Every structure is written in C-alpha cells, then in structure tokens.
Amino acid sequence: MGLLGPDGLVTRGDIRYMDQNILDIPEKEKRKIRGAGIGMIFQDAGASLCPIRTIGEQIYESMCAHTKITRSEAKTRAMDLFDKLNFKDSQRVWDSYPFELSGGMNQRAGIAIAMLMNPPILFADEPTSALDVSVQRQVVREMLKLRELFGTAIVIVTHDIGVVRAMADTLLVLKNGKTVEYGTADRVLDHPRDPYTRKLLEAVPKLQRKVRV
C-alpha cells in the first residue's frame, strides 16, 4: 500500500500480483492496482476517512481515481452496494460526515468504499478490533457476504480467534515477522503443531463454569 514511508521500505523479496512484482512497477501503475485490484479495510475507519468531506464525496473521489464516472453514477453504484450490505439509511450515510456516524457505521462505510471497484483481493487490517461485540458480528457477516457475492479473496490480519474461526479457510501464524505455522484453519486451530500457536490459543478466555447439582 506504500503507507509506511522510508522506515517501512521493503528491501528484500517480492510482492507478486497478477504475475508482476509490485515493487518494480512505477508509482502510477501502483495507483491503478490500489483500490481496483487490491482493496483495503483499515482498523480504524474513522481515522482513515477525511473528517471534512462527506462519505458520498469520498466515494465519488475514490471511484474517479480509477474510472470516468459521473457523481450520479457513483451514487447509484454506492447505493446498490449499501443495499446489499443491508444499510438501513443509505441516503443518510451518503450525506454524512464521518464524525456524524458511529464507529461501526464508519467501518461499514469503509468496507463499502473498499469494495466499490470490486477488487479481486481485499486486505482487512484488524477490521473488528475497535468495535463492540454486536457490531463485530455484523461486520464479519458483511465481509462473508461480500466474498459470496463477488468472489473476493479476503486476507485478514487479526488476533481475534473468533474472527479467524468465522472467516478463515487458510491460516498463517506469524511470530516476530516470521511464519511459524501454516495450514487449513481447522487444522491449525484444532491441532496446532507450533508451541507459539498453542500459547495463542490457550490465551483465549474460556467461558466455563462449574454447576453443582
């Protein structure tokens, strides 16, 4: 995504997308990939959205970066996606500034913005961490629905084992930036082989209590 500046510069290895190394292509070509080829959902949508522009304006600007489109056409596409995601008041979301929406609604709007160009790959960086449990469940359902509707491959970065169980087909466990375990989600979660993976799973609180009869 190119968001980290010099300190986050990749100095070794490749980032492969559609048979090309993203690190080797010009910035102009990278811009075509971001959004249209690879979408991104950030951990805190409120921080990633511009506070002085409405959601509708930001959607229109995002779409204009990739295709020639009128404001009315952009709105029609956005409203259609809002409806598919079961937004209760699509017009209000379109007209609102981020600070006028709840954290959960901002996150849902961020998901919609990430999917407007129907990218084949969607990165989700801790998309539920800043949300309460009920909104987390809703956001997970919406991402699963997007995968079903559009065939999107979702790469989710999370420490939430519940989200992993709900969404993941394949699971990669990292420790200090290195892979310690990789396999199907069911295998890794139910039969972990690496000590670090086992410790992660043991750290999940167990909702159990003893009942005397």
Language model features by range: what are they?
Residues 164-166:
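A short, surface-exposed alpha-helical micro-motif characterized by mixed small hydrophobic
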Residues 137-150, 162:
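Helical segment within the ABC ATPase nucleotide-binding domain
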Residues 122-125:
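Catalytic Walker B motif of ABC-type/P-loop ATPase nucleotide-binding domains
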Residues 182-183, 191:
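ABC ATPase "signature
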Residues 9-21:
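Conserved ABC transporter NBD signature motif
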Residues 116-120:
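A short, proline-enriched helix->beta-strand linker immediately N-terminal to the Walker B motif
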